[in-house]
């Protein structure tokens, strides 16, 4: 496989508007052939999706999804640029897929890692810094270990970082990029809410055996 230089990555990014990591993947998959890399990105629906991301996405739709058994429900808003695209099959499929993704990810609380508040980051840092397995390690090593753990934890909280439930080889971010590339518009997941039946309700625990015994005594 040909070496993938920084210049090749930059040139491909300038040409297609795709992200740096996507360009690296494309060049690695095509042995550094720039023309084939462009085709690879287009096949994946990634080429030019990044350039579209600067345009205003004020249209779109709010969708609801109720999981089988009616124990989990999701409300989600995804934006695009035009009402025409919002009503199209491809955008509606994205709405359904991302709604199902939220339903399947009970630990996800934010759209992206950028949305996670500083206090959450500091809390996670404090937890990791206090772990026993860091005792005795040099400070510089400790910091690197903690940063890695925090990064992993924050990704677990972010919807866009999750492996897509229908194709774990891509993330939700890549799914959205692919859709944006195919429909030719900026597409943004704006917000979501996940509901779980009975969440937040305190259920009084009872001693079933004691209840049966008391019923017999009363009888």
Curated annotation (Swiss-Prot):
Domain of life: Bacteria
Keyword Nucleotide-binding: no
InterPro entries from the UniProt entry: EF-Ts_dimer_sf, Transl_elong_EFTs/EF1B, Transl_elong_EFTs/EF1B_dimer, Transl_elong_Ts_CS, UBA-like_sf
Gene3D superfamilies: 1.10.286.20, DNA helicase RuvA subunit, C-terminal domain (1.10.8.10), Elongation factor Ts, dimerisation domain (3.30.479.20)
Annotated localization: Cytoplasm
GO molecular function terms listed in the Swiss-Prot or TrEMBL record: translation elongation factor activity
Keywords: Cytoplasm, Elongation factor, Protein biosynthesis
UniProt-annotated stretches for the region Involved in Mg(2+) ion dislocation from EF-Tu: 82-85
GO cellular component term, pick one: cytoplasm
Family under the similarity heading: Belongs to the EF-Ts family.
Functional note: Associates with the EF-Tu.GDP complex and induces the exchange of GDP to GTP. It remains bound to the aminoacyl-tRNA.EF-Tu.GTP complex up to the GTP hydrolysis stage on the ribosome.
Name this protein carries in UniProt: Elongation factor Ts
């Amino acid at each position: 496989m040909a070496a993938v230089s920084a210049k090749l990555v930059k040139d491909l990014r300038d040409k297609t508007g795709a992200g740096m990591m996507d360009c690296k993947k494309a060049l690695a998959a095509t042995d550094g052939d720039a023309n084939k890399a462009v085709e690879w990105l287009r096949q994946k629906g990634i080429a030019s999706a990044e350039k579209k991301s600067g345009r205003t996405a004020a249209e779109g739709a709010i969708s609801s999804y109720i999981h089988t058994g009616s124990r989990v429900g999701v409300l989600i808003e995804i934006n695009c640029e035009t009402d025409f695209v919002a009503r199209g099959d491809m955008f509606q499929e994205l709405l359904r897929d991302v709604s199902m993704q939220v339903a399947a990810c009970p630990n996800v609380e934010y759209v992206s890692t950028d949305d996670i508040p500083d206090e959450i980051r500091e809390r996670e840092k404090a937890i990791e810094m206090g772990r026993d397995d860091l005792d005795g390690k040099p400070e510089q090593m400790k910091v690197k270990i903690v940063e890695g753990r925090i990064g992993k934890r924050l990704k677990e909280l972010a919807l866009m970082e999750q492996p897509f439930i229908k194709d774990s080889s891509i993330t939700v971010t890549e799914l959205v990029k692919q859709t944006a590339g195919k429909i030719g518009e900026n597409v943004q997941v704006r917000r979501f809410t996940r509901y779980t039946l009975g969440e937040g309700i305190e259920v009084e625990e009872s001693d079933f055996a004691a209840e049966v015994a008391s019923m017999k005594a009363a009888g």
